């Protein structure tokens, strides 16, 4: 798939453009560089980060198989995000169940020395473009510090219980993920109105379910 220039952020006198590229079209050097940058961005030497477990191999695996938004400067990657397809299961007040085609946002990170320049906004602009063009709903798991940013962009905080559909135990609650989930409805099935106070269930994967 061809890359596509989708959004820009002006930083330090230069214009940086986020480009969209599928995992299958990433060369190994770019893929490895993105992984290293994201790992470093999630690591907090002070130990005060929300991401106490840092960025795991499973976390990186979750970011593969979909579209990546990349911003580079002088050949070095300075911002990254990805959106991958998942299914979210939701049952409305009428009892009807829905398996919603979801664009799930992963591995959004900006290199430490480039934070505060609007690069994260440019990455999210690109990822939201993918969500609006290909999915029924967007979703992501956000840290407390990031909540105001997503709310300002129109994402909805999920207030109801969260759960995961496991291969051996059926639906299992994920209380540790309650109130960290945000959704962005963009093309819901006719007649469906989400009630964010109800339960929502994600598909199974290794590592963190959400």
Curated annotation (Swiss-Prot):
Domain N-acetyltransferase as annotated: residue spans: 21-189
PROSITE patterns, per database record: GNAT
GO molecular function: acyltransferase activity, transferring groups other than amino-acyl groups
Enzyme class label: transferase
Positions that bind CoA: 108-110, 115-120
Keyword annotations of the record: Acyltransferase, Antibiotic resistance, Transferase
SUPFAM superfamilies hit by this protein: Acyl-CoA N-acyltransferases (Nat)
Residues binding substrate, per UniProt: 54, 106-107, 141, 176-177
Family annotation (Gene3D superfamilies): 3.40.630.30
Matches recorded under Pfam families: Acetyltransf_1 (PF00583)
EC number per UniProt: 2.3.1.-
GO terms classed as biological process: response to antibiotic
Protein family membership: Belongs to the AAC(2')-I acetyltransferase family.
The protein's role, per its UniProt record: Catalyzes the coenzyme A-dependent acetylation of the 2' hydroxyl or amino group of a broad spectrum of aminoglycosides. It confers resistance to aminoglycosides.
Subunit structure: Homodimer.
Protein name (Swiss-Prot/TrEMBL): Aminoglycoside 2'-N-acetyltransferase
């Amino acid at each position: 798939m061809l890359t596509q220039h989708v959004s820009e952020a002006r930083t330090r006198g230069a214009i940086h453009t986020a480009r969209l590229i599928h995992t299958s079209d990433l060369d190994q050097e770019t893929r490895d560089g993105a992984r290293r940058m994201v790992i470093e961005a999630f690591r907090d030497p002070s130990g005060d980060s929300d991401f106490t477990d840092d960025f795991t191999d499973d976390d990186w695996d979750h970011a593969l198989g979909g579209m990546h938004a990349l911003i580079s400067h002088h050949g070095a990657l300075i911002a990254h995000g990805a959106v991958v397809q998942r299914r979210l299961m939701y049952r409305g007040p009428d009892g009807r169940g829905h398996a919603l085609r979801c664009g799930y946002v992963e591995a959004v990170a900006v290199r430490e020395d480039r934070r505060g320049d609007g690069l994260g906004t440019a990455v999210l602009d690109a990822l939201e473009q993918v969500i609006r063009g290909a999915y029924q709903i967007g979703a992501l798991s956000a840290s407390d510090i990031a909540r105001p940013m997503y709310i300002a962009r129109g994402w909805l905080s999920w207030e109801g219980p969260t759960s995961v559909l496991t291969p051996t135990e059926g639906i299992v609650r994920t209380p540790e993920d309650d109130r960290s989930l945000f959704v962005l409805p963009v093309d819901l099935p006719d007649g469906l109105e989400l009630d964010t106070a109800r339960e929502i269930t994600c598909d199974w994967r290794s590592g963190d379910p959400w």
